[in-house]
Every structure is written in structure tokens, then in C-alpha cells.
Amino acid sequence: MPLRPRLLLLCLWGLLLQQAETDSEGQTTGELYQRWERYARECEETLTAADPPSGMVCNGSFDMYVCWDYTAANTTAQASCPWYLPWYRHVAAGYVFRQCGSDGQWGPWRDHTQCENPEKNGAFQDQRLILERLQVVYTVGYSLSLGTLLLALLILSLFRRLHCTRNYIHMNVFLSFMLRAVAILTRDRLLPTLGPYPGDRTLTLRNQALAACRTAQIVTQYCVGANYTWLLVEGVYLHHLLVIVGGSEKGHFRCYLLLGWGAPALFVIPWVIVRYLLENTQCWERNEVKAIWWIIRTPILITILINFFIFIRILGILVSKLRTRQMRCPDYRLRLARSTLTLVPLLGVHEVVFAPVTEEQAEGTLRFAKLAFEIFLSSFQGFLVSVLYCFINKEVQSEIRRSWRHRVLHLSLRDERPCPHAELGPQALPSRSAPREVPITGSTLPSGPLHGPGEEVLESYC
């Protein structure tokens, strides 16, 4: 049997076994498989004996689930629920629907909701309701993050005094969060219109629409991967400043750009090739063959673990420096807690919580807990990063206040006009010199600056 039909058979067989594991019909796995084989054999015999109709038609075939007869082009075919299903007596009157395109090719989707196990429908509806609510949550989160990230990116771009390697990396992190949000929101807009829902028997997915849908999936995977690699760049750069260089902000920015935007292509492109060759089904939104999904999942897990170890190392450095300053216990704990909470969203440390739990292990309550945790924090992560590293950053606030003061002074000097009857003198002339500007090198804390190599870096980040 060719590899692709074999994979489809394995996926179908796993689905049937999952639904039949609590079946009350008394069939064993061997009996179910024998019934399926007999159904497939009878389908082939029926199609061989039948005479294909004239004109443009979709060929009769067995798609590993149900037997399809020859169908005229641009019509919706229907087939009775396959009798090998363990719960067939409950769905004997049901049908499976599939669209035959105008080009004589079967559409990739089929509607088999009338043939599903009725005992599982209640649980399915509950799960669907939970997923719909989670979708609302992350839609709000990504939309909010997109707006704040755009504003933060404009602020760091417009104020030249804020231009430095550290903020350049921040800007790329903001951009990666924005691309991730746009890609996910766009994909969600495409899937409901391109993918049929239960009861929609006439919807079909044309070749162009299918290509657009898969392209959206590819772009989404790249943007998500780029987001994780740029979080890794933040961790590597901060570790480089604190441990290797000892406080210098002069880094190899081109290498960081190559790592942040180039590394995701190293695992997204192989995933696209393997997916196209071995699991080229529907819109690529389902990962039935887990081995293919691990091509993308493995590099992301590696970036999460590396950033977690960097996070632990930075906390160790911070603890040692705070102890050196002999801070009082309340101040010590407050500073450590604030630094921890500040670095968690920037490095994506929260991902470690469910990183050991694979997709295969996550079932039932654990699966929904993992989804809720990751979806909520990932969607609002961009919002938190933009607030912590732009809007409440003391360096950014100082630059905005300085620019505002200069703007107000400029307007007041422009509107002020000399009086012709007044006695002019040196004391009556307004001063044209601006207040002395103090170079901004980083944010300072009320507890006072740290001293020593790398201290200014910790002040800027923590």
C-alpha cells in the first residue's frame, strides 16, 4: 500500500478506535477491522462493476471512510453512513456529504457529522464551547497586544536618543509579536470561511482557496517560530552583556538579525516539504502525524529551555549583586520579585510550565488546562512586554518628557511677540537657550543604582 494512503488509514483507524473504546456493541478491534476490510472490498467490487457516466464526473472511490459513487461535476454527493461503524444502528439513516468540483475533482472536505457516535456528541459540544471561549480570549489578547506593540515600536523608532543595540533588539521583538498576532488573527479569519462546519453541505474549497489557506498556515508557523527565536536573542544578548562582555552594549547586531529572522526558516521549510509529501491533507491545521509536527516543536522547545537556563543564571547574578549591596530583607525580596516578574514575559519563561507535557500526553482536563494557560499568556505576552519595556521604562518616559518640554518651549517662543512701545533691553529679551540636557543612559531606581560591571544592564532590564 502506498505511504500516503497508509498514513490516512492509520489516522482513520486511530479515530475509530478512540470512539469505539467504550462501545456497547460488543465488537472487538479485530472484528471491527474485518468489517472495515469487507466494506472496502465490496466498495471496490461495486465500483468495478458500475459503468462510469458520460461527461465530466468525479471518479468513484473509497476514501478510507466511506464509498463514493461516480458523481456529476459541480454537485454535492451523498453516501449512507458506512455500516462497519460500531454505532451504525444509531446512524443508519444518516449521510456523508462531499462536493464534486466543476473540474471533476473531489473537494478535500467531507461532512460526516450525521455518522458520528451520538454518545459522544454531548462531550463534543462541551469541548467545542470551551474552545470557542478560548478563541475569544486570545483574539482579545492578540488585538490588544497588536495595538500597544505598534505604539511602542513607533516610540522607539521616532526618538533617536533611544536608538541603541538593546532597543533595536526590543524593536525586533515587538515586530515579531506583531507578526505573530497578525498571522494568527488572519488565519482564524480564513479558516471559518474556507473550512466547512457541520450542516454546511454545499461549501467547497477550491484549489486557489486551499493554497491560500495552507500559505496562511506556513506564514503563521514562521511568525510563531520567529517570535520564539527573538525571545532567545533577548536572552542571549542579555547573558552576553552580563557574563561575557561585562556591561558593554556593543553586540553583533547582524548576527542577531540573522538568528532572529533566519533560524525559523531552517525548520519551517523542512516541515513544509515533509508535510506536503506525507500529510498533504485539508488546510494543514491538524497534526495527525505527530512525528511531522515535532519538526517544528523541537526547535521551539529548545529555545524555551535555553531561555529558562539564561533566566536562572541572570537571577543568580542579580541575587549575588543584591547581597553585595547588603540590602535590607524587604527591599531585597521586593527587588528580586520585581526583576523576576519583569524578565518572565521578555524571555518567555512561562512556557516552561507545560513544556514537558507533549501533545500526546495532554488529554482531558490537562489538555484544556494547558491550552488555557498557553493561549492566555501567549496572547497577552506582547502587551506585557510593550508596557514593561516601553511605556513604564524610565528611559523612555524621560525622553518623552524632554521632547514635550522642548515642544512647549518652542510654541511659547513662537507665539511671543515684542511690544513696540516697551522699552527693550537685555532683561526683556527671552532666553533662546534650552535647558541643559542630561544624557540618558538608562533608568534608575529609587533604591539607588547598582555598582560594578553589568549593573547598568540590570538597571535597564530589571
Swiss-Prot record:
Record SMART domains: HormR
CDD domains on file: 7tmB1_GlucagonR-like
Keywords (A to Z) from UniProt: Cell membrane, Disulfide bond, G-protein coupled receptor, Glycoprotein, Membrane, Receptor, Signal, Transducer, Transmembrane, Transmembrane helix
Disulfide bonds: C43-C67, C58-C100, C81-C115
Any one GO molecular function term: gastric inhibitory peptide receptor activity
Residues carrying covalently attached carbohydrate according to the record: N59, N74
Entry comment on modification after translation: N-glycosylation is required for cell surface expression and lengthens receptor half-life by preventing degradation in the ER.
GO biological process: adenylate cyclase-modulating G protein-coupled receptor signaling pathway; cell surface receptor signaling pathway
Record PANTHER family: GASTRIC INHIBITORY POLYPEPTIDE RECEPTOR, PDF RECEPTOR-LIKE PROTEIN-RELATED
Subunit architecture: May form homodimers and heterodimers with GLP1R.
Name of the protein described by the UniProt record: Gastric inhibitory polypeptide receptor
